[in-house]
């Protein structure tokens, strides 16, 4: 399973999401891929007001504010598909 975190520097919610995902990684088996939306104009346009955004195996799962329970539920849904 690959979890992609769409983020950008200076985004405190993105920093919180990264830390949360790093903590969850201790109990869940996934590869974390972080993408800075400022490096791609299309991604910036798509996500700039929504970050942080988490995608699981390419499917958007969470955005904005979320907690560990939300992440674990999204991971479980991703494993079920």
Could you tell me what each predicted segment is?
Residues 30-41:
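Thiol-based oxidoreductase modules, predominantly thioredoxin-like and allied folds used
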């Amino acid at each position: 399973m690959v979890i992609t975190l769409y983020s950008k520097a200076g985004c405190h919610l993105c920093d919180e999401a990264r830390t949360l995902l790093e903590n969850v990684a201790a109990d869940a088996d996934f590869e974390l891929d972080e993408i800075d939306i400022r490096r791609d104009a299309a991604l910036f346009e798509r996500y700039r007001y929504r970050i942080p955004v988490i995608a699981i195996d390419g499917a958007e799962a969470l955005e904005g504010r979320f907690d560990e329970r939300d992440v674990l539920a999204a991971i479980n849904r991703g494993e079920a598909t």
